[in-house]
Amino acid sequence: MSNETTKPVNAGFAKILPVMFAFFVMGFVDLVGTATNYVKAEFGLADGTANLFTTMVFFWFLIFAVPTGMLMNKIGRRKTVLWSILVTLVAMALPIIAYVALSGTARLVLIVISFAFLGIGNTLMQVSLNPLLTVFVKGDKLASTLTLGQFVKSFASLFAPYIAIWGATQLGMWWILFVIYLVVGIVGYVLLAIDKIDEPAPDAGTTTIGRC
């Protein structure tokens, strides 16, 4: 009888590339800070009102974290991440519509709604993305791969202010940031949707808060 220990097989980088793309999309939530600076100046908002935008984005985690875990148990990890990207894409599209078709209070309302969608999408992704990564990477490499994912995520927040400044100075449209990130998000969604992932079957039993 063999005493050899079976080591976990880790997927190559090409297999986890779509997941790394999803980590980048998860970083979109940090552009709220950049967007708030421009929105505050455009609409003459008070500091307290503008600060509520950032707080509101992360408030959604308190509301949706547990329901997202329940959802993930029902539909699986990848589908939950895909839904999170779709919600984030809606968040990217709404400001574009606001600046192309609306003005005044209607524009501000749509931007605020987009921030809410961004917070909800980020919550869905925070709950489901790390578990999805464990399908590909196991053992002692998991911690370093999670760190890599957070590193990739940080680039989204790093690039956001520079893209907004470029858009404002060169095009007169700081919100071109949302257009660029919308395109990147679509690419990330497609890559993850077509990737073949052999993940554990969704929980077939009754999903409760206690089991999340």
Which residues make up each language-model segment?
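Membrane-interface helix termini in secondary transporters
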Residues: Y38, G69-M70, K74
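Helix-loop-helix hairpin linking two adjacent transmembrane segments in secondary transporters
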Residues: L148-I197
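Short amphipathic helix-loop junctions that connect adjacent transmembrane helices
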Residues: T34-G48
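Central cavity-lining transmembrane alpha-helices of secondary-active solute carriers
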Residues: T55-M70
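C-terminal ends and interior cores of transmembrane alpha-helices
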Residues: L86-G104
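Cytoplasmic helix-loop-helix junction between adjacent transmembrane helices
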Residues: S114-F151
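Pair of pore-lining "gating" transmembrane helices in MFS-fold secondary transporters
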Residues: P8-A35, A116
